[in-house]
Amino acid sequence: MAKNRFNQHWLHDHINDPYVKMAQREGYRARAAYKLKEIDEQDKLIRPGQVIVDLGATPGSWSQYARNKLAQGKKRDTEREGGIDGTIVALDILPMEPIADVHFLQGDFREDEVLHQLEEVLEGRDVDLVISDMAPNLSGVASADAARIEHLCDLALEFAQNHLKPDGALLVKCFHGSGYSQIVEKFKQQFKTVAPRKPKASRDKSSETFILGRHLKRPR
């Protein structure tokens, strides 16, 4: 009974969420697009000509937003064909519906086959920006969840170290709580500038936050 009440409350909040309504109106697949939008507007992350990699991209709202920023011309409809000034590669182990001008690679980005496909798309270019909205399936056990969250951040950090330009940036999702300070410390070891970000589009009750690292300390 309590679970049903929880589901009803969640559904009510979701339906009445202004970001959900905005996403539906503007053609985004998820409200998460507005988290990236707010951070991008604050930090000027996405610029014409960039190479951007979106880790854990499904369902694709972050790639949609990045695509819109790189779209040529004044009109930036979410699914408008017409090319972009830059390259976007989206990766996920789950399938994703196609997005115009976005290269999607399905598979684990730690595997050689997927990395080979990525290298073919990049054509020898380093990456300007890595974005990751990845989140584990949470169990409710704090220690286990902290380890899973930290693991995903570690994967993103390793990927960034191997593919970013020296002045590139990495934006990842994490959660306040056990293990958060360790994640921040790892970012500080790898990047010259590290800053937390809590966009308004993040739900008030959520411990979700984002960490932005810029300028590698030890480029490849």
Curated annotation (Swiss-Prot):
S-adenosyl-L-methionine binds at residues 60, 62, 92, 108, 133. It comes from Burkholderia lata (strain ATCC 17760 / DSM 23089 / LMG 22485 / NCIMB 9086 / R18194 / 383). HAMAP family: RNA_methyltr_E. The active site is at 173 (proton acceptor). PANTHER family: RIBOSOMAL RNA METHYLTRANSFERASE, RRNA METHYLTRANSFERASE 2, MITOCHONDRIAL. GO terms for molecular function: rRNA (uridine-2'-O-)-methyltransferase activity. Residues 195-220 are annotated as: Disordered. Its main location: cytoplasm. This is Ribosomal RNA large subunit methyltransferase E. It comes from the Bacteria. The keyword Cytoplasm applies. Its EC number is 2.1.1.166. Specifically methylates the uridine in position 2552 of 23S rRNA at the 2'-O position of the ribose in the fully assembled 50S ribosomal subunit. It is an enzyme of class 2 (transferase). InterPro entries: RNA_methyltr_RlmE, RNA_MeTrfase_FtsJ_dom, rRNA-MeTfrase_E, SAM-dependent_MTases_sf. It is found in: Cytoplasm. Belongs to the class I-like SAM-binding methyltransferase superfamily. RNA methyltransferase RlmE family. One of its GO terms (cellular component) is cytoplasm. It catalyses: uridine(2552) in 23S rRNA + S-adenosyl-L-methionine = 2'-O-methyluridine(2552) in 23S rRNA + S-adenosyl-L-homocysteine + H(+). Transmembrane segments: none annotated. Keywords: Cytoplasm, Methyltransferase, rRNA processing, S-adenosyl-L-methionine, Transferase. Pfam families: FtsJ. Coiled coil: none annotated.
